Amino acid sequence: MTNIRKSHPLIKIINNSFIDLPAPSNISSWWNFGSLLGICLGLQIITGLFLAMHYTSDTATAFNSVTHICRDVNYGWILRYLHANGASMFFICLYLHVGRGLYYGSYIYSETWNIGIILLFAVMATAFMGYVLPWGQMSFWGATVITNLLSAIPYIGTELVQWIWGGFSVDKATLTRFFAFHFLLPFIISAMVMVHLLFLHETGSNNPTGIPSNMDMIPFHPYYTIKDILGLLIMLTVLLALVLFSPDLLGDPDNYIPANPLNTPPHIKPEWYFLFAYAILRSIPNKLGGVLALVLSILILAIIPLLHTSKQRSMTFRPMSQCLFWLLTANLLTLTWIGGQPVEQPYIIIGQLASILYFTTILILMPLLSTLENHLLKW
């Protein structure tokens, strides 16, 4: 008799995806982040579901309902902070996952890569709408500023913004629809994750050398299940340390002030994981130009497969490209820092230089250096 795990219509899909899946024998811990992202998504959906049971999406009661969750609901405080800091862990894993893809040339699998970019946009949209829900000062003003950027779109901009707001300002209708979409999107993301995995399993995983590993594969279970559990334990340790010791470390104190349309906070800024894009937006003195740069800062990932000029897939054996990759990483950290600073010198010029360097590195320096490396290796 065949093993049920290999014959049952449903279980065999799970078996072929997570148990008997052939995986390269040499993939490093950088390949852990996919499973960590799946766990983050599951955690966010579960904590979010329980929070939604007690939250009210009305401007008069939203702020108080979050306070009620923290004070009166059994373990409500841990649900709320797991959800808020879980989002931070989600983005740390996301950025490391994308960085891994860039470093090891995983973008050559273009279907998987493109679905990944759409997933990144969807997660960013979900996180933005979630930040609006507690209805604190930064929630309200963040929603106002970011949605207002759409008014830069020629001809339809103003109407589009008012259509999204459901009125002439961010108000009751905006909060209700943001809650509806914030609840819905994670389930759409879950479906897209399945498509992401479907395309990945068509080609199989890449590996640190960038060389096909079809002749040297091992089963996913037990080797990589155990390896993923180690990654999970490390992530959970960091998350629980954040939640239990300093839950507000990554948040903004202004969000503990109820939303007040008549009082603007001195520095409007998004959560830390959007600061690099916010810095790029602010570095361009023109509204439409800034919005375009903001979108392109993420959308640029879509053309990276076209900019791959190297004869090697991975950066493992390309020390010059490695230097450029770490320069890009340092540049993104600089942009993140600048995004949280007030709009004054020297921050303005640093932000502008870092923004120029970001696009220059990806669009010009990386392809040129890859070509130079080919010549140096006489390829």
UniProtKB/Swiss-Prot annotation:
One of its GO terms (cellular component) is mitochondrial inner membrane. It is found in: Mitochondrion inner membrane. Heme b b562 binds at H83, H182. One of its GO terms (molecular function) is ubiquinol-cytochrome-c reductase activity. The keyword Heme applies. Gene3D superfamilies: Cytochrome Bc1 Complex, Chain C. Binds 2 heme b groups non-covalently. Heme b b566 binds at H97, H196. It comes from the Eukaryota. It is a multi-pass membrane protein. Coiled coil: none annotated. PROSITE patterns: CYTB_CTER (PS51003), CYTB_NTER (PS51002). GO terms for biological process: mitochondrial electron transport, ubiquinol to cytochrome c. SUPFAM superfamilies: a domain/subunit of cytochrome bc1 complex (Ubiquinol-cytochrome c reductase) (SSF81648), Transmembrane di-heme cytochromes (SSF81342). Its main location: mitochondrion. A ubiquinone binds at H201. The cytochrome bc1 complex contains 11 subunits: 3 respiratory subunits (MT-CYB, CYC1 and UQCRFS1), 2 core proteins (UQCRC1 and UQCRC2) and 6 low-molecular weight proteins (UQCRH/QCR6, UQCRB/QCR7, UQCRQ/QCR8, UQCR10/QCR9, UQCR11/QCR10 and a cleavage product of UQCRFS1). This cytochrome bc1 complex then forms a dimer. Component of the ubiquinol-cytochrome c reductase complex (complex III or cytochrome b-c1 complex) that is part of the mitochondrial respiratory chain. The b-c1 complex mediates electron transfer from ubiquinol to cytochrome c. Contributes to the generation of a proton gradient across the mitochondrial membrane that is then used for ATP synthesis. Belongs to the cytochrome b family. PANTHER family: CYTOCHROME B (PTHR19271:SF16). This is Cytochrome b. It comes from Cistugo lesueuri.
